[in-house]
């Protein structure tokens, strides 16, 4: 593991028990807890997968940069299998403790420890902004390598144009060195990695309070006002 990746891994090792607390401090002004945002994105991911595949229950899904596995209790019941990988061995140990049915691996931040075309869907949630920018193309290329042709790559990221998002990133202890990507940058990253039909949509334009408000939030998907966004690309053959 090179020094940059080791520094990232060591930083997140420190937050294996206090990750949620650190995020909650940063978003306290919103009146919401991290669980609400996690649930909203997990449900969005499940809807996204279901809209592209007829039988989600047969799919193999990989979470790249999975941390402590916050999204896996929502995902595991609706897909065939979930795997998670992260550079932080401490976070992976915590994730395995919380989600014993999920398969976890630690990696060095370079080559993912999986075979070519192993997964139907690969996703990452608010991960790329922790990756050094010179490694963004390599990160996307690895997600593409392990995803089968016709499969999906799904990326969730912070919207750097949203003022409250910038405040959260500034106030979050482990986001202080983050470099945020615009929607256009993420679209370009996936396209250059070998994805077609790359689409980006806003999410979390409204607070994730559930019910009607969550449904209403989807009507704003085509406007660039969400605090975060989703990028989806179909992996091409070759």
What are these regions (language model features)?
Residues 1-55:
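Conserved class I S-adenosyl-L-methionine
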Residues 137-149:
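A short glycine-rich, Lys/Arg-flanked "PGG" loop and its adjoining helix->strand segment in the class I
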Residues 159-176:
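Short, glycine-/aromatic-enriched active-site segment of Class I SAM-dependent methyltransferases
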């Amino acid at each position: 593991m090179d020094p940059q990746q080791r520094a990232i891994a060591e930083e997140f090792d420190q937050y294996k028990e206090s990750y949620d607390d650190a995020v909650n401090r940063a978003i306290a002004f919103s009146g919401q807890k991290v669980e609400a945002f996690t649930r909203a994105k997990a449900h969005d991911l499940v809807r996204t997968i279901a809209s592209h595949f007829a039988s989600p229950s047969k799919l193999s899904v990989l979470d790249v940069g999975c941390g402590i596995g916050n999204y896996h209790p929502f995902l595991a019941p609706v897909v065939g299998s979930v795997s998670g990988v992260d550079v932080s061995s401490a976070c992976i140990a915590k994730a395995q403790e919380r989600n014993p049915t999920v398969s976890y691996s630690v990696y060095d931040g370079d080559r993912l420890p999986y075979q070519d075309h192993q997964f139907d869907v690969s996703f990452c949630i608010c991960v790329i902004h922790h990756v050094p920018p010179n490694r963004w193309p390599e990160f996307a290329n690895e997600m593409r390598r392990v995803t089968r042709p016709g499969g999906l790559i799904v990326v969730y990221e912070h919207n750097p144009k949203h003022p409250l998002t910038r405040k959260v990133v500034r106030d979050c202890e482990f986001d202080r060195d983050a470099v945020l990507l615009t929607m256009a940058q993420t679209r370009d990253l996936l396209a250059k990695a070998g994805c077609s039909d790359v689409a980006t949509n806003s999410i979390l334009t409204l607070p994730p309070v559930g019910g009607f408000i969550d449904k209403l939030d989807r009507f704003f998907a085509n406007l660039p006002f969400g605090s975060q966004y989703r990028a989806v690309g179909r992996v091409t053959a070759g």
